[in-house]
Amino acid sequence: MKVQPSVKKICEKCKVIRRHGRVMVICDNLRHKQRQG
């Protein structure tokens, strides 16, 4: 999980979602998991 000021999709499988008011990226590739913070 990377915590970054701005989250972006890295590949086509990445999905940007909101959980508990946080913007997150989820993907099949676990290296692509990101959270905005």
Swiss-Prot record:
<dbReference type="GO" id="GO:0005737">
    <property type="term" value="C:cytoplasm"/>
</dbReference>
<dbReference type="GO" id="GO:0003735">
    <property type="term" value="F:structural constituent of ribosome"/>
</dbReference>
<dbReference type="InterPro" id="IPR035977">
    <property type="entry name" value="Ribosomal_bL36_sp"/>
</dbReference>
<dbReference type="Pfam" id="PF00444">
    <property type="entry name" value="Ribosomal_L36"/>
</dbReference>
<comment type="similarity">
    <text>Belongs to the bacterial ribosomal protein bL36 family.</text>
</comment>
<dbReference type="GO" id="GO:0005840">
    <property type="term" value="C:ribosome"/>
</dbReference>
<dbReference type="GO" id="GO:0006412">
    <property type="term" value="P:translation"/>
</dbReference>
<protein>
    <recommendedName>
        <fullName>Large ribosomal subunit protein bL36</fullName>
    </recommendedName>
</protein>
<dbReference type="GO" id="GO:1990904">
    <property type="term" value="C:ribonucleoprotein complex"/>
</dbReference>
<dbReference type="InterPro" id="IPR000473">
    <property type="entry name" value="Ribosomal_bL36"/>
</dbReference>
<keyword id="KW-0687">Ribonucleoprotein</keyword>
<keyword id="KW-0689">Ribosomal protein</keyword>
